[in-house]
């Protein structure tokens, strides 16, 4: 239903347009998928694009340093990394976790370390959200048919339910209706028919 596009084209633009957060209206934003190794992929996202830097150059050891921090601090690792960064108290951080269903999609019952990695990943988010003095925010996108799997994570599931938004599936006509109303421009009916035919033949477009 276009969750990723909605976040990146809509919410990110709004955030970058001086949206007020706990640490002012300046933001660092990253987006990643949990995949098979959510902690490692989080470290990759945190060490990319000067996310946690103001003027200094990132260190080549950042990824390894962050990974080590999570091993030592566990669920408080992200808070520790952020509080030691240049942007702490100066910028907000928005972390978009895309395709959160990756956590449940890949069978990991045969690998205890990978299963524990998933549990730690969820606890990292949980502990960070509950810390009111730290300006880290999360957007989590997940397929609706995986939502019930979050129920086994207790308070984490409860926290998500307080700010849950279901993005409805739009058919072609509804999609263009919303565009016309939101962006205030008209589209030739012939062009709409042509696009609809092309999309029905090649949905991947």
PLM segments and residue spans:
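Amphipathic helix/helix-loop-helix segment enriched in hydrophobic residues with interspersed Lys/Arg
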Residues: 1-205
